[in-house]
C-alpha cells in the first residue's frame, strides 16, 4: 500500500542570538504564508547568518519558537568542517566576511552586474526583480535577458515597471547559456552574478556573494545557498527531501593547486560546487574560460549542464571557487509531478552533456576526465539508485526525521537522461552551427 502524499510544510526563518542562545525572531520566509501547526522547515540563523536547517513538528498550543529553538541548538552543536574543501576554507577565510552580517566592515564588494535570463514568466520575474532592487550592495546593475520571447510581456514589464533601474536585453536564440553569454556581453560589472527568475534574493545575497572577490584576486567563482521558498506540494517536498539545491552551511574553497584528497573525481563533480540560480564569476575569469558553452542549458537539446560546465572551465583555467551559505536565495520549486519528472531527466542529461562539452572544448582535460569517468558514472548511477531504494533518512535537505522515498521511476529517468546527454549536446552543437550558417 502506497504512503499518503506529504502534507504542506511551513517554511520559516529562526534567528538565534548564538549557537546556544535565545530566539531573536521567528518569521515566515519572504512572501510566504504564516506558520501553522504541523510540520515546519526552518532556516536557522545565528545573529543573522545562515547556519543550519531543521525540520520539526509544532502541535496546536505549542510555542513554535521554543520547539524550533531546541531543535536548532541541537543541530548547531553537531556542525563543523568535515571535508577537505571545508577545511581549506576554514584555514583560508575571507577576512571579515566570515563574521556575522552586522559586524562586517572594510571589504567593499566590486561593481557587480546581476544577469537574470527569463522566458515568458513576467509575474515570477517581477517578484525576483523586486528582491534584487532592495539589495544592500551599493554598486550594482541588473540586466534582464529576454530569451527567445514569443510575446512582449517581459519587455513591457521591464520598461514600464522598472524603467532605467533594470536593463533589458533581447536574445532570440533559445538556450540558457546563450542568454547568459548575451547578458555577460552587455554587462559592465567587474563581477557577473547570475540568478533565476523563480527566486527571491535575501537582502544581503549580493554583498555576501561578491565580497570574497575583493579579498582574493585568484578567485574566479563564488556560489551560494539555495533554499525552498515553499514546500506546499508533494513534488516540492520530494525534491527538497532529497537534497534540493542546497550545498550545506560550511564555507568551502576549491583550489586547483590544492585538489581535495577526499574528492578523487575533482574537478568533474561540478554538482557539488553550486547551482546556476546562485553563482557569480569574476568577469575576466569567465572570459578567459571561454564563457558558457552555448550548446548547453535549458532551452537546448542538451537540457542542462551550463552552470556545471562553467564551474569546471573556470577551475581548469586556474581560478579558485568558493561556496558561502551567507549568499542566500529562496527558490520556488516547480509544483507538479510532471515538472519533477522533467527535472530528473534534465539533471541526468545535463550531467553528461557538460562532461561531453568539457571534452570537446577543453581536450587537454581528456586524460584526467577519462581516468575519472568510469568511477564518476558509477558514482552517479549508484547515487540515483540509492535514492530510489533508501527506505528511511532525514528530510528535507537531510535535516529532518521523516522520509518520502525517491521513486525508482525518477531514478530511471535520471539514468536515461545520462545516456541521452552526449546525444543532446551533439544535437545542440549541430543546431548552433546550422543557425550560424544561416546567418541567425
Where are these regions (language model features)?
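Glycine-rich, basic loop-to-helix element that forms the pyrophosphate-binding segment
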Residues: 154, 171-187
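Conserved donor NDP-sugar-binding/catalytic core segment of glycosyltransferases
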Residues: 204-247
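Acidic donor-binding segment of Leloir-type glycosyltransferases
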Residues: 130-170
